[in-house]
Amino acid sequence: MVRLSRLGSLSAFILLWAAAAAAQQGAAVKAALAADEVCTTCHNETWAKPILAIYQTPHGNRADPRAPGCRSCHGPSEGHLSDFNTSPDVVFGAASKRLSRAEARNAACLACHDSKVLPRMNWIGSQHESHGIACTSCHNIHAPDQKVLSKATQAEVCFACHKAQRAQIRRMSAHPLAVTGIGSPPKMVCSDCHNPHGSTGPALLVKNSVNETCYACHAEKRGPFLWEHSPVVDSCLNCHTPHGSTNASLLKTRAPFLCQECHSGDHAAQINSGANLGTGAVTTINGLQQAGAAATRAQLAARACLNCHVLIHGSNHPAGAKFQR
């Protein structure tokens, strides 16, 4: 009986505590909505821009005490409250003629999304920050579905500014991003390689170097190898263009021309020179065709240099110094 009595008392206490917490939360929600009502009396559902849609987002979740109110972002805006023709302290709308400076808009966001709270952010001094890009250039805070956070639509947000990359990603060889007009399902997003909020690496890369970023997916190319290929060790960008190419495997140009950017002399061993392929044999890797040469050279057909040098990223074979095995 004593045990049952104690259980009953504990249950009653839990119920009372839950009821008190719910009442307190309800009071907080009402207080937050009342504070917003100063703004939503005018900025209501009749506006062309879906102002009230923010209540369908984490920023408008009034059950969350961390969620900001209207004036948390737009400032006290006392002048706007007394005279509608006066702008709020901070104006975010890109279409507005009274748009606040990027620094003011970003400061409103960073008041909560601080680098001390969110270590992933290296915003101050980043390329985006230095070029006057605001958080709201990419994020639509009032929209319940933010395009930049969706795998299916993120690329289109980035391509609004990065138009050269929009064209490149439509080339024959490209990473599988979601692009309007291309039906393949997305397997990657821009933020898989780039951190738009800032980075310690070049080009806002998520890793400290180009190679480390590429190796996150292409781990088989990482090595270490017994025989290293110096351009590969230096940077993947020596041979590849990451956003799209008219050549296979995102190559900057096709072999043998790509190889000849470094290997400009005669072929070291003169093997497969084409000397036994017919008329007009060519004996150097640079001599694509001498006078009267009509035969197709083994060095130029199909994958060209890669016909023999198949492990071009590096080899662990004891006899793999030429990357042939």
Model-derived regions, located:
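Short sequence/structural segments immediately N-terminal
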Residues: 21-325
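N-terminal secretory signal peptides that target proteins for export/translocation
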Residues: 1-5
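Bacterial N-terminal signal peptides
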Residues: 8-19
